[in-house]
Amino acid sequence: MGITILKNEGLDFHARISTPLSEIDDDIQKELLDLTKKVKIAGFRVGKVPVSIVKKKYGTSVRNDIIERRINHSVNHVIKEHNLNIIGRPTIEELQNESDKALEFTVKMELLPKITIPDLKKISLDRPKLEVNSKDVEEQLEKLAALTKNYTKESKAKIKDGDQVTIDAIGYIKEKAFEDGKLNDFKVIIGSNALIPGFEKQLIGSKTGSEVDVNVTFPENYHAKDLAGKDARFVVQIKAVHTAEPTVIDDEFAKKFQSNSLEELRTHFTKQIENESEEAINTIMKMNLFDKLEKLLDFDVPESLLEQEKNILKSGTDKNEQDESLLKDKSSKEITAYYNKLALRRVRIGLLLAEYAKSKNLQLEPDDLRKVIMQQARNFPGQENMIFDFYKNNPRAIEGLKGPALEDKAVQYIFNHEIKLKEKKYTKEELEKYLEAEEQRITLI
């Protein structure tokens, strides 16, 4: 076997490989002889079929198999001989495969870069810490009390905020009743904003038995596209009005929600408020870490990975209205530069984290995959069981989660064992503003 290196620069390795015709012919002859002992051909006993007959029947397929094996063997030999850390499948070009000539071909391989892990202990980040106060907890208790109000007392007074109103309604657009515009015995809490914006407010001041004309405009993003943005008039019959009995927030109230006391329910809400912000904090912390890493990394990345990531980004933007709006006023040159920079960042950080996980011998556990599946499910409120069933019944989809799961594990390990974290305290209101600002920023990265 002859090997001529054509290119060994950066992350590209190209070589021309040749195998003498005599070696190919020897391999073919051995294979044909072996087949004479196995094949069944009419008119011949097994093991007594002439080579010429076997060659006539199987010669082409045998040659193709031998060529494929020789190519694979030669490529693997080059990889081992030159200690190449390749990515993807080698590309075979300029194949010379005539039956009377030596086997020759060019192999092109893309290499993974040599990655030096930076000193992560030099990185420091602020970690937001939510300080839940009594006001935050009391607001949650009030919301819970409002949701569980008992509307048993019928009222003949004028409708006011907080009343439960039972209505019949027929909707008209340009004086024509429209499909799905009818409500029967529909109960709505005034001020809950359960109906189209402005609908509930126009019922205030009316009484049981009265008829009210309600004029509204369907939101532009209304789920029924044929109604979105259109003006409508509803003829509403007020059938009943009920006021809520006052809710006393005490130990008895708490017991309705599997708590032994009001204090225990308060503790539950404190933890719930803390947990609600934890996922958003972790996402932002991860992006802040990536910001730091991006400045430390300058190695070349494989072109194939870069192109793959750019295609993923473009596909994602096409489906995401928020991302699309960020780029709508940009020139094609600016959009290309944006994708190039973001793809380079993601590929570099992904390769670094894979190398870091390898250096620390981090292994995926079932819990790691469960966490990623839970994160996916939270993106589809109300469809969680469908997401769980999808991954349960699709092993290949689970395989696709292993990369992100290992990346998350590496990031968590870095947070716990490498970088310096400084706790920064926020009130609930301050944290919400911070998270909102950060979430807008990270949509760009």
UniProtKB/Swiss-Prot annotation:
Keywords annotated in UniProt: Cell cycle, Cell division, Chaperone, Cytoplasm, Isomerase, Rotamase
Signal peptide residue numbers: none
Domain topic, free-text comment: Consists of 3 domains; the N-terminus binds the ribosome, the middle domain has PPIase activity, while the C-terminus has intrinsic chaperone activity on its own.
Domain spans labelled PPIase FKBP-type: 162-247
Subcellular location: Cytoplasm
Function: Involved in protein export. Acts as a chaperone by maintaining the newly synthesized protein in an open conformation. Functions as a peptidyl-prolyl cis-trans isomerase.
Family: Belongs to the FKBP-type PPIase family. Tig subfamily.
Organism: Rickettsia africae (strain ESF-5)
Catalysis: reaction(s): [protein]-peptidylproline (omega=180) = [protein]-peptidylproline (omega=0)
GO cellular component labels: cytoplasm
Gene3D superfamilies reported in the protein's UniProt record: 3.10.50.40, Trigger factor ribosome-binding domain, Trigger factor, C-terminal domain
GO biological process, one term: protein transport
Principal cellular location given in the protein's record: cytoplasm
Protein name per Swiss-Prot or TrEMBL: Trigger factor
Cytoplasm listed as a keyword: yes
A GO molecular function held by the record: ribosome binding
EC code: 5.2.1.8
Enzyme class: isomerase
Gene responsible for this protein: tig
Taxonomy, superkingdom: Bacteria
